[in-house]
Structure formats: structure tokens, C-alpha cells
């Protein structure tokens, strides 16, 4: 598998993990920014990032990601202000600033690191 294929696989596994982690026993998950509820799988919910996936330091950071509906994640550009307020409420006052600072770090994940992350999140999914 190419590196691009490995990144795509990790994105897919990580996205499923985030959505299922916050789903209830019936598979219903709530959008982090608008509270809309939908089934975790399919078009209804996505893995929303506070700081864009372009930041390699935060692309697969669990604190940076929460389930978001398509409208908030894509049409409303992630609702970053509301996302930040919710992160600060959940983790403490400075969480959004901490993530913003971390996003400026230069990170290059090795291929073995990416493969390890795929294995880790596949294991997490099996245990859900």
C-alpha cells in the first residue's frame, strides 16, 4: 500500500472511531456544535476537526476531533467558534489555545507510525 493509501486508511479508521466513541448504545451520535442527532454511520455524521486535517500534528489527535453533522462540518466550515467554546467547556479554559499552539508544530509521521495507529484504532473499534 502506498503512503497515500495508508493515510487514507488511517483517516477512515480514525473517523469511524471518533463517531462510534461518542455514539450511544443505539449508534446515535450528537453533533458537537449544533446538537443534531443522527446515526454514526453514513452521510449524517462526520469526524469534525477543530483545527483542520492539514495540521499533521492534530490530524489524528482525539482532543481535536468530535462528531459533527455534514452541515456544521462542511457548509458552516466546522463552526470553529462554537467548537472552541465547547472544547474549553469540556477540557478547561485554554484547550482551544493549546490545540492552536500544537497545530504550529512541525510533525512528520513515519509510515510505521501510521500503520501502528491503524492497528491501534482497529483494536479500539473491535472493543466497542
Show the residue positions of the predicted features.
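Short, charged surface segments at domain edges that flank catalytic/cofactor-binding sites
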Residues: 1-30, 107-112
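Conserved aromatic-histidine-acidic binding/catalytic patches
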Residues: 6, 57, 75
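Histidine-centered nuclease catalytic patch
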Residues: 30-64
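Short Cys/His-centered divalent metal-binding micro-motifs
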Residues: 36, 65-92
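Short microdomains enriched in Cys/His and/or Lys/Arg
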Residues: 51-65, 88-102
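Short flanking/linker segments adjacent to small metal-binding domains or redox-active Cys/His motifs
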Residues: 95-128
Amino acid at each position: 500500500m502506498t503512503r497515500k493509501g495508508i493515510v487514507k486508511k488511517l483517516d477512515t479508521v480514525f473517523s469511524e472511531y471518533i463517531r462510534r466513541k461518542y455514539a450511544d448504545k443505539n449508534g446515535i451520535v450528537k453533533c458537537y456544535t449544533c446538537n443534531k442527532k443522527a446515526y454514526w454511520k453514513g452521510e449524517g455524521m462526520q469526524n469534525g476537526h477543530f483545527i483542520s486535517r492539514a495540521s499533521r500534528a492534530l490530524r489524528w489527535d482525539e482532543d481535536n476531533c468530535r462528531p459533527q453533522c455534514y452541515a456544521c462540518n462542511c457548509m458552516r466550515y466546522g463552526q470553529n467558534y462554537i467548537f472552541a467554546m465547547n472544547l474549553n467547556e469540556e477540557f478547561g479554559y485554554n484547550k482551544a489555545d493549546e490545540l492552536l499552539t500544537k497545530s504550529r508544530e512541525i510533525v512528520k509521521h513515519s509510515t510505521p507510525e501510521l500503520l501502528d495507529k491503524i492497528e491501534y484504532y482497529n483494536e479500539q473499534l473491535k472493543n466497542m
